Amino acid sequence: ATSNSKPTQVLLATFLTFFFLLLNNVNSSDELSFTINNFVPNEADLLFQGEASVSSTGVLQLTRVENGQPQQYSVGRALYAAPVRIWDNTTGSVASFSTSFTFVVKAPNPTITSDGLAFFLAPPDSQIPSGRVSKYLGLFNNSNSDSSNQIVAVEFDTYFGHSYDPWDPNYRHIGIDVNGIESIKTVQWDWINGGVAFATITYLAPNKTLIASLVYPSNQTSFIVAASVDLKEILPEWVRVGFSAATGYPTQVETHDVLSWSFTSTLEANSDAATENNVHIARYTA
């Protein structure tokens, strides 16, 4: 569900403020924090896979663009080079994290689009799977959607209404994916062609909740989805974080441009550090 009212934005802003206060006050043993306001070609802090690159204007282009036009069957990923410790095998502690980024998806023909992009966490040595992976957003293929993947992702899926992807709902959507392309929770996404989207994804370790939210400031619409996800049961102790995107048929192409990105994670030394008030976030889901 969606909302175009200010109360939703106030709730979101209040939650995010509260989350960062939580991160700043816990006794942490490991943390990673970075902000990239403008990407540069051959960005040293990023690992590029497939056809991902940085343009001369400082935009992270996850899929191939030639002469300003998106190209068919393009797959690309960009990951932050430094691994993130998402949980501690000795103490059992699990990290909370928050990531925010702005991005644009622009299609020559907005009525038929594919395939979308995703933010994901995966093993440090994760690579683009072999085979045709466009409809799997460069994260999976038709033979590896199982627990061996060790991948958690939030997808921004632009392809819908086709039997080719029977797992998808009949609308563009934001989905939470665990080890496979079929989302465990989705919310309808009223994508704006060429609009700048502001996305925030947070994970609250004390109650194992992953929350994804997206706002289009240009028309004051927001979208929020949340699900229970146990990162310690799904991911290895160390992961890399990044983006993946893909395009499909020649008539169903789009750009996948990330304009800025920030990330903060804190591995709590005491998993009971959060109070009851810190985990009441179900009210923000639609």
Swiss-Prot record:
Binding-site positions, N-acetyl-alpha-neuraminyl-(2->3)-beta-D-galactosyl-(1->4)-beta-D-glucose: Y73, D115, K135, Y159, D165
Glycosylation sites: N89, N141, N207, N219
Pfam families attached to this UniProt entry: Lectin_legB
PROSITE patterns (alphabetical): LECTIN_LEGUME_ALPHA, LECTIN_LEGUME_BETA
Signal keyword on record: yes
Residues annotated to bind Mn(2+): E155, D157, D168, H173
Residues that make up the propeptide removed upon maturation: 278-286
Source taxon at top rank: Eukaryota
Binding residue positions for Ca(2+): D157, Y159, D165, D168
InterPro entries recorded: ConA-like_dom_sf (IPR013320), L-lectin (IPR016363), Lectin_LegA_CS (IPR000985), Lectin_legB_Mn/Ca_BS (IPR019825), Legume_lectin_dom (IPR001220), Leguminous_Lectin (IPR050258)
Keywords assigned: Calcium, Glycoprotein, Lectin, Manganese, Metal-binding, Signal
GO molecular function terms attached to this record: carbohydrate binding; metal ion binding
Signal peptide stretch: 1-28
Function: Sialic acid-binding lectin specifically recognizing the trisaccharide sequence Neu5Ac/Gc-alpha-2,3-Gal-beta-1,4-GlcNAc/Glc.
Family as reported in the entry's similarity comment: Belongs to the leguminous lectin family.
Protein name: Bark leucoagglutinin
Source organism of this protein record: Maackia amurensis
Lineage, highest ranks first: Eukaryota, Viridiplantae, Streptophyta, Embryophyta, Tracheophyta
Gene: MAL
